[in-house]
């Protein structure tokens, strides 16, 4: 494929979530030289933490498995995990990029046997499970992690003074002295696939997140429902471990609200519909309430919505949750309005799920990247730098892949 | 051929198995010494393998970890090594030191040796590819697709059935905002895009032209067209279907008042506004009130079950320009849910600022003509009350979007002339992770024909489809498969002398890769093939094979399974999909979940490639039961070859006869849906199956 602009052929993709991964693979399979830089020790980003995708309720691991196989066999693609872009110099067609490679403390001799884990004395907060459980300081980042290799959290690890993992590893795979290093890449184009993070629910004071343990966010709900999650897929009240059979969802928790996120996050309605199916699958006698402003299920997703509307166990209530209280017995009590019935009502629930929105990942961009952003922080294309997926606007997984695929052509073709 | 054999004693394998004994047993049977190393994927182990693989005429066999991991550590020149999964699927899920554990490992090694011996190196069939891309449809998507392809150096032929380019976008008066601050209406830009296309020397535009037939395959599609300039014939490398949408047939909506003089559609309003004459058709007067009915036909299983996605923003836009052209008119907008995703919310908020635009949630159930051409509108479930009547001087039906799909390409494929469509009527991919996964290789749908989307989405989609089109021409030209078996150089070979012309392969190929001659003999279009092996599974006379994957090879593996010593011990064959079920097995191992040691897992490219002769092979040898694990079928199918589990299931229905002939119970064969996330369920599934087999008792053929 010829570039529309003169310059270096290489392509740098920043971010290894579903957008960056797809962009890298599509570009490499079309014969381009690609460098993929990911900050975390694994690829897959946010989708690697999803239990299922809407509307097919299939596992995200299925697509990741295919993508990782594509990646492993492609020689045109070089992946750097635990890597951050430190500096970008030059201009469209000729960028010199400095990438910092943070130490993994586990080298490529690791076989993923897992012997190091029981030896490690330190527990750390598991950020992938939003702090709902812990791992040891040495851990495998996921069951289909790519690369399939252990990693050590330097903030938790006690380092050489402990060194028990080093002793038990038969393969000499652990190097607690590993230092960071840098590599310099020369590329013609940059694809920005920096993704999103969930909006901080603590900022929505009326919803009492952090005050009552049985209030969780939608991303936490994904982990609670996941087979490999902190509860092994059991849906239980975090407060006392009782089955979560009465579940309510608060839509637009932060989104469509000028005090928080003025835009619509685009996926939260579908995420809650999907999560309603988790509850009903686990507990057929459960009841679900969804408090919404508008249910937004575009295109064929509407058919999924219609299927759930036909289920009498799910009640859709147009209205806002005004207050959340805790009853003396420990139950949560939701005070909400039902706009269509014109009344306020109270509802006891076991679990309250906040459908928090998506914020463009506010990764401080390295010096040298000058990219215009809209008032919300979403990136706008600029010469040589093409944003894709969530870096650009809220969108679902399918749209991210579409955008990543097309974004490659836009970047190579010289638009922007 | 004697494949060199290496065994790894690391990661718990050496503690679970007596590798020395295994090595000796293999040497006795295959006359090739096994080399044991405690760290086979380490530099020393690798060097040891490398030294032997360079001279080997077949793959080396590695008894170590799962083929899914550490692939980059082992040399693959020219053959990828045959990986026998002694770690995840034996050492990590079986009782250490047990005789049955040892027997399982021995069988897996024997099966691996048999498979390696029957793996030939696929030789890619390279073809000279025509690079021209055909874009069908000259609307927003098609125009952008043409420009994108031309920009990266690919010639384009752009077909449009109308006289002029631009499609429905040409009829738009204004556009909803696409850039920050997402408040102001935009001037249409379609004329500019058309001019760019018409001025581009790499794009050949054929207007007033339609396709008569499309034959051939990627790299060499022969397209015949008919149009004002007469018939034409040309060859293209790949095709983008960008035929766009049509408004839903509004005559089917008499309940919503269509037929009354002052009930119009969104598109008619757009044309009126473009002429600056928003007037009532009945009397030519300026309407004092205009009411928009959203979801006119959409979100209604009796009409269009889907949401048309763009009507909310379109109606908001129209409300705003009515406000400009008719400042005194009241505008009512009755919506079911206001759908303005992402930054579209800013535009919604902008329209809410207008005092004369009333936005109300509700559902319009009836529109009736009353005096003077005015209309009475019944609205239910609104915030105004359970049921209210509103009066308007003009009603606009925001009619939904219907894909302009169907018989456009007139494909000369044995499986029919059109792109396969989903239940919704859109020729879309069924995969969230792979929106361009198509059932007609080299042909990609884009824009509103694929799914409802706005013009921003169409531009993105056009670029995505062009990239996939270029990719298909690039990969296929090298003799390699496109998604999902990207890079696979193997292809099905037909030993046609023995073909019985039963047509099963040509009927079942999920990609329409096989055509037939008059007698019904299959004719492979190799560039359409995606290497799933469905044809190989379908063939009753086993004449279809791949160089590195075939029934003979699988059958040889089945024959390597040993029979147990004790009546209580079972032999169960599990044929599993390599993309979903196989990783699920690995995950069960990773969690150290105990499995029945009588299981022997054989990965398949897809359950669609499962040939039922393997059942007879297995059961007549004394295997107690066969379980197939594949992806979900039905409307929400997961199979990346669409119909793998479904076909396997159908084939199993037909094996009753085989079982009856062998006087065996139907329960000895089972198919279950297993997804990649089902690692936690695998043990339970196999235990249940094993319990059932124990009740039936050992296969009477055991030991015969």
Question: Across the structure, where does each feature detected by a protein language model lie?
Answer:
Chain B
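C-terminal functional segments of enzyme domains
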Residues: 360-366, 674-704
């Amino acid at each position: 494929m010829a570039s529309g602009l003169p310059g270096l052929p290489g392509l740098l993709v920043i971010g290894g979530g579903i957008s960056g991964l797809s962009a890298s693979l599509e570009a490499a399979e079309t014969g381009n030289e690609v460098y993929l830089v990911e900050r975390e020790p694994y690829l897959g980003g946010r989708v690697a933490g999803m239990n299922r995708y809407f509307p097919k309720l299939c596992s995200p691991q299925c697509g990741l498995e295919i993508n990782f196989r594509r990646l492993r066999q492609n020689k045109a693609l070089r992946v750097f995990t635990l890597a951050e872009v430190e500096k970008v110099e030059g201009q469209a067609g000729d960028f010199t990029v400095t990438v910092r490679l943070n130490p993994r403390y586990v080298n490529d001799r690791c076989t993923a046997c897992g012997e190091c884990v029981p030896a490690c004395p330190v527990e750390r907060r598991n950020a992938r499970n939003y702090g709902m459980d812990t791992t040891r300081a040495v851990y495998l980042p996921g069951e289909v992690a790519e690369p399939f290799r252990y990693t050590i959290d330097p903030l938790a690890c006690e380092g050489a003074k402990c060194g028990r993992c080093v002793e038990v590893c038969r393969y000499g795979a652990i190097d607690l002295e590993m230092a960071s290093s840098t590599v310099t890449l020369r590329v013609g184009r940059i694809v920005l696939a920096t993704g999103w993070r969930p909006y901080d629910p603590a900022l929505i004071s009326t919803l009492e997140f952090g005050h009552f343990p049985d209030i969780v966010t939608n991303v936490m709900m994904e982990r609670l429902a996941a087979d490999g999650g902190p509860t092994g897929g059991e849906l239980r009240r975090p407060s006392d471990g009782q089955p979560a059979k009465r579940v309510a969802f608060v839509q637009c928790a932060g989104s469509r609200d000028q005090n928080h996120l003025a835009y619509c996050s685009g996926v939260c309605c579908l995420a809650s519909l999907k999560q309603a199916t988790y509850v009903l699958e686990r507990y057929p006698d459960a009841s679900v309430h969804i408090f919404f402003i508008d249910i937004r299920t575009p295109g064929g997703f509407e058919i999924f919505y219609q299927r759930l509307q036909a289920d009498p166990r799910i009640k859709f209530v147009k209205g806002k949750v005004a207050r959340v209280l805790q009853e003396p017995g420990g139950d949560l009590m939701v005070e909400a309005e039902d706009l269509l019935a014109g009344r306020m009502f109270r509802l006891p629930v076991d679990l309250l799920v906040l459908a928090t929105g998506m914020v463009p990942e506010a990764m401080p961009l390295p010096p040298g990247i000058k990219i215009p952003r809209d008032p919300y922080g979403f990136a706008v294309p600029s010469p040589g730098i093409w944003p894709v997926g969530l870096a650009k606007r809220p969108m679902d997984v399918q749209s991210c892949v579409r955008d990543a695929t097309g974004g490659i052509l836009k970047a190579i073709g010289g638009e922007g | 051929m004697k494949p060199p054999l290496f065994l790894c004693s690391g990661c718990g394998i050496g503690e679970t198995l007596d590798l020395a004994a295994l090595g000796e047993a293999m040497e006795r049977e295959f006359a090739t010494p096994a080399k044991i190393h405690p760290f086979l994927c380490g530099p020393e182990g690798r060097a040891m393998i490398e030294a032997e693989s360079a001279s080997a005429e077949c793959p080396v066999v590695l008894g170590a970890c799962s083929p899914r991991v550490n692939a980059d550590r082992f040399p693959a020149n020219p053959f990828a090594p045959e990986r026998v999964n002694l770690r995840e699927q034996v050492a990590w899920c079986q009782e250490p030191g047990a005789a049955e554990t040892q027997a399982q490992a021995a069988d897996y090694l024997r099966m691996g040796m048999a498979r390696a011996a029957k793996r030939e190196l696929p030789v890619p069939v390279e073809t000279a590819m025509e690079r021209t891309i055909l874009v069908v449809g000259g609307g927003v998507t098609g125009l952008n697709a043409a420009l994108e392809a031309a920009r990266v150096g690919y010639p384009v032929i752009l077909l449009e059935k109308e006289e002029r380019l631009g499609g429905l976008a040409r009829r738009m008066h204004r556009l909803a905002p696409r850039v920050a601050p997402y408040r102001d209406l935009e001037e249409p830009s379609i004329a500019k895009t058309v001019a760019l296309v018409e001025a581009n020397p790499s794009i050949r535009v054929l207007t007033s032209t339609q396709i008569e037939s499309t034959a051939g395959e990627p790299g060499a599609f022969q397209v015949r067209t008919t149009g004002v300039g007469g018939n034409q014939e040309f060859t293209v490398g790949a095709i983008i279907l960008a035929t766009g949408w049509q408004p839903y047939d509004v005559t089917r909506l008499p309940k919503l008042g269509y037929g009354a003089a002052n009930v119009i559609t969104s598109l008619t309003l757009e044309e009126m506004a473009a002429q600056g004459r928003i007037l009532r058709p009945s009397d030519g007067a300026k309407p004092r009130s205009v009411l928009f009915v959203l979801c006119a036909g959409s979100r209604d299983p009796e009409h269009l079950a889907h949401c048309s996605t763009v009507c909310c923003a379109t109606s908001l836009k129209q409300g705003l320009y009515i406000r400009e052209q008719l400042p005194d008119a009241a505008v009512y907008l009755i919506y079911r849910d206001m759908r303005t995703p992402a930054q579209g919310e800013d535009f919604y908020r902008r329209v809410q600022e207008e005092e004369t635009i009333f936005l109300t949630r509700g559902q319009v159930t009836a529109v009736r003509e009353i005096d003077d051409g005015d209309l009475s509108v019944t609205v239910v479930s609104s915030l105004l009350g359970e049921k209210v009547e509103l009066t308007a001087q003009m009603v606009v039906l925001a009619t939904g979007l219907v894909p302009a799909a169907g018989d456009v390409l007139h494909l000369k494929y044995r499986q029919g002339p059109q792109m396969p469509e989903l239940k919704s009527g859109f020729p879309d991919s069924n995969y969230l992770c792979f929106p361009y996964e198509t059932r007609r290789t080299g042909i990609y749908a884009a824009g509103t024909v694929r799914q409802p989307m706005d013009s921003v989405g169409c531009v993105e989609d056009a670029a995505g489809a062009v990239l996939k089109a270029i990719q298909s021409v690039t990969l296929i030209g090298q003799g390699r498969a496109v998604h999902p078996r990207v890079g696979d150089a193997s292809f099905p070979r037909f030993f046609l002398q023995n073909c019985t012309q039963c047509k099963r392969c040509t009927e079942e190929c999920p990609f329409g890769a096989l055509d037939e001659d008059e007698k019904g003999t299959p004719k492979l279009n190799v560039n359409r093939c995606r290497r799933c092996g469905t044809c190989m599974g379908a063939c009753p006379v086993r004449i279809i094979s791949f160089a590195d994957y075939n029934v003979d090879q699988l059958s040889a593996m089945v024959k390597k399974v040993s029979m147990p010593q004790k009546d209580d011990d079972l032999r169960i064959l599990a044929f599993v999909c390599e993309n979903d079920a196989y990783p699920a097995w690995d995950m069960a191992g990773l969690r150290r979940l105990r499995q029945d040691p009588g299981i022997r897992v054989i990965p398949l490219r897809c359950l669609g490639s499962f040939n039922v002769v393997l059942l007879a092979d297995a059961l007549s040898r004394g295997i107690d039961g066969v379980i197939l694990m594949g992806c979900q079928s039905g409307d929400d199918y997961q199979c990346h070859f669409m119909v793998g589990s479904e076909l396997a299931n159908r084939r199993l229905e037909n094996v009753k006869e085989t079982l009856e002939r062998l006087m065996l119970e139907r329960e000895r064969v089972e198919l279950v849906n297993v997804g990649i996330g089902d690692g936690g369920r695998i043990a339970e599934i196999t235990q249940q199956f094993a319990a059932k087999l124990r009740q039936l008792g050992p296969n009477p053929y055991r030991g015969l």
